[in-house]
A protein has these predicted regions:
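Carbohydrate-active catalytic/glycan-binding domains of CAZyme proteins
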Residues: 23-332
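Bacterial N-terminal signal peptides
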Residues: 11-21
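Bacterial N-terminal signal peptides that target proteins for export
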Residues: 1-12
Length: 332
């Protein structure tokens, strides 16, 4: 059975590679087809950029596998194939809803290891849960832990989805963040495949409206000049108003102070750009040059299943002298 699954994955991966051997165009979107919830990684091992995402275009957010694309210049993207399939024996605890992944590259001894976190639908039923798979390569193959690492909400409501991983350059400690309807964070153990349960902290930004910063989902954390930046998405992923807001903290587990001007990225109807959110952030290594990677609704599906027809985009993100984030102008 294992051989059959591997053959299936290899065949499917080859099909993707043949269909999208390389994708390049001026402007956005940067990937072919429908993808959402993008996570970007720069690999110190390969000196390439990688994007991981929810495979979109399926009714009811029913995608069941993850693919990965690589690039050396953020413009030309190569399909590396399927790296995790939730409907195969590769992931014994889940059977679908492969959503919103994140990944961390860690130097373990003298070898780079890759820890891939994601949410899936458990075979036992109930709400979504979060799992982890590992690899020696950013493109895989990945081996799942065999069971979820986050199964329940610390608030008693919401979903265990939209996981983010962050390693604090100040301390070397790594953290997970997750939650729809709430934001939770916890320190990871050194093994990167389990959390320190005693550190679980509910840190949902309070207040706001759907027009500014009312928290919905998709936490993302990064560090710059002594501050921890927390980003999140507002409203529903199928809404043109879906957008990104942020706050800051002096600690990786909060509390979070909402920014005076919290909206980072929002729709631009004049350019037919709708629902730009659920982002990750890239700092170009060795520079203070930053990019925001996000999805938006494909304009042709604005009135027909917009929440499952999304496309991945990249734009520059800049800071004011006081460290606040300038509002990003989304581009086509």
């Amino acid at each position: 059975m294992i051989v059959t699954i591997k053959q299936t994955l290899i065949a499917f991966g080859l099909l993707l590679a043949v269909t999208f051997p390389a994708f390049a165009q001026s402007g956005n979107p940067v990937l072919p087809g429908f993808h959402a919830d993008p996570e970007i990684l720069y690999s110190n091992k390969t000196k390439k950029y990688y994007i991981y995402s929810t495979t979109d275009g399926q009714p009811g957010w029913g995608g069941w596998y993850f693919t990965v694309f690589s690039s050396v210049d953020l413009k030309n993207w190569k399909a590396e194939g399927v790296m995790l399939d939730l409907k195969s024996d590769q992931v014994p605890w889940a059977d679908g809803n492969a959503w919103a992944p994140c990944i961390e590259e860690k130097l373990v001894g003298d070898q780079y290891k890759y820890f891939f976190y994601y949410s899936g639908n458990p075979k036992t039923g109930g709400g979504k849960q979060i799992g982890v798979a590992t690899s020696d390569s950013p493109a895989g193959p990945f081996v799942d832990l065999g069971h979820p690492i986050i199964t329940d909400s610390p608030t008693g409501h919401g979903q265990q989805i939209d996981v983010d991983v962050f390693t604090d350059s100040a301390s070397g400690k790594s953290y997970l963040y997750w939650g729809n309807g709430y934001m939770a964070g916890a320190e990871l153990n050194d093994d990167m495949i389990s959390i320190k349960k005693e550190t679980i902290t509910v840190m949902t930004p309070e207040g706001g409206t759907l027009q500014d910063y009312a928290y919905r989902e998709a936490a993302y954390v990064f560090y710059r000049n002594g501050l921890y930046y927390f980003m999140w998405s507002v409203d529903d992923t199928g809404s043109p108003n879906y957008h990104v807001a942020y706050g800051t903290s002096t600690s990786p587990l909060g509390p979070i102070k909402v920014a005076k001007t919290p909206v980072v990225l929002i729709q631009n109807p004049e350019k037919e750009i709708y629902g730009p959110a659920h982002n990750s952030i890239l700092q170009v290594p060795g520079t203070d040059k930053w990019y925001i990677v996000y999805h938006r609704i494909n304009k042709n599906y604005l009135k027909s299943d917009p929440g499952v027809h999304r496309e991945v985009c990249i734009d520059r993100m800049e800071f004011n002298e006081d460290g606040s984030i300038k509002q990003v102008i989304p581009t086509r």
